[in-house]
Amino acid sequence: SYRANYNASLVKIKQVSSLASEGIYYRLSTMLTKPVNISQTMAHDSLLIKLLEEEGSRYQEAGYQETIRKYLDTYKNKYAYDSVFLVSASTNNYYNFNGLDRNLARGEDENVWYYNFLQSGEEYSLNIDNDEVAGAANKITLFVNCRIRDASGRVIGVVGVGVNVDYIKGLLQEYEKEYDVATYLINEKGEIEVSSLYNGHQTADWFKVNDSEDI
């Protein structure tokens, strides 16, 4: 009957949607797990912890800054990330694969992510922002931020990696073609973080974009 066929079609649609969601979720989880794991590995590296503990006495040494630069550059090249960075909690100096980049002064909009993360209590977080480092052309980037603690548990720095959002958008476009569905990464507020059309730096409400405000 029509109703039986209709109900069967609904079940099939739900099954396909569920499989698509699971497949996309698995792939995205796999993609995001690696940069988180790499960032956590650096956060627990005794060499990096020692370098941060020695910053006060060695900061002016050219060799000190070069050691940090080489360390971060090695991770960038090995894992092909767009950015690898380190921030000292004692000086707020921001280092990346090119060396000392800048100081993250409190009260400046582009540094809010850093102070919010320190105050959050989270061991790691993901945020989307412009890459402010020299030569990055302000590209929209997904950053992983991880706390670095000394032996007593005191936070002495933040380390992490960055992945260009265009790369993630490209993956979502591939998934949309493969599964014939629209894909979005949204936060707890219902705002679109990344999709094939949005880069996360624009504020877009998923419910409004999809005319689903009554859900």
Regions found by a protein language model. Give the residues of each.
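Amphipathic coiled-coil signal-relay and dimerization helices
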Residues: I49-L52, V87-G99, G190-L197
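Extracytoplasmic/periplasmic sensor domains and loops in membrane signaling proteins
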Residues: R58-Y71, N98-D131, L197-I215
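Extracytoplasmic/periplasmic ligand-binding sensor regions of membrane-associated signaling proteins
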Residues: N77-A80, S88-N164, I168-G170, E174
